[in-house]
Design a protein with these regions (language model features):
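C-terminal glycine/acidic-rich active-site capping loop/insertion
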Residues: 11, 95, 109, 129-173
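A general structural signal for well-ordered alpha-helical segments in protein cores
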Residues: 17-18, 66-67, 173
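Structural detector of well-ordered beta-strand residues that form the stable sheet scaffold
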Residues: 5-7, 37, 83, 116, ...
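Alpha/beta-hydrolase-fold catalytic nucleophile elbow
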Residues: 39, 85, 134
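Rossmann-like dinucleotide-binding domain that binds NAD(P)(H)
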Residues: 46-114, 120-125
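A contiguous active-site-proximal alpha/beta segment in oxidoreductase catalytic domains
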Residues: 1-48, 56
Length: 173
């Protein structure tokens, strides 16, 4: 009615490597999904004041993208178990306020697949965004610290593409 487009900001769905990987998973190129992983590490050094950051920020603003990615890649399945551990490893002095800067989450889906999501607020080597889906017939990997390409591994071999680094992977999106 307002004539504007409204969209939730889950930008990985529009990044080329992630869309390519999702297509491979969804068209059955890697078979039945067994394991998924998604990793987000923000570039360091971490300079924000932990007192100004809500305690659950690592979950609500960082890992939320990993959760969306895992659910998108494992389309049609629902999480049935979730376990999380988080701590203030970068800023242990902020631990008592509830601030968490590092977290790992394990998810079991109703189709039997198991997923992990990992986040950190401080990767001194730069922005690091990666993912992987292991299936009964192959594997697809997305991103790495020096590349944003998708890599597909099957019995037929592997395919590798490389692209820009840092946030340039989202420029076309």
């Amino acid at each position: 009615r307002a004539g504007v487009v409204l969209q939730v900001g889950f930008n990985r769905r529009f990044a080329e490597a992630w869309a390519t990987a999702a297509a491979a998973v969804h068209n059955g190129a890697i078979g039945t999904v067994q394991r998924l992983s998604s990793l987000t590490r923000d570039p360091g050094p971490f300079t924000a004041d932990p007192a100004r950051i809500a305690p659950a920020t690592i979950f609500n603003e960082t890992l939320i993208h990993d959760f969306d990615t895992l659910n998108w890649l494992n389309a049609g399945s629902e999480p049935v178990e979730v376990y999380a551990v988080a701590d203030a490893l970068i800023r242990p002095d902020a631990r008592s306020s509830g601030f968490r800067d590092s977290a790992v989450v394990t998810i079991r889906y109703d189709n039997g697949a198991i997923a992990t999501a990992e986040a950190s607020f401080c990767a001194m080597y730069g922005y690091d965004l990666r993912g992987e889906v292991l299936g009964s017939a192959g594997m697809v990997q997305m991103g790495e610290p020096t590349s944003s390409g998708a890599r597909l591994f099957t019995a037929a071999g592997k395919s590798v593409t490389t692209a820009g680094t840092d946030t340039s992977r989202y420029h076309p999106a």
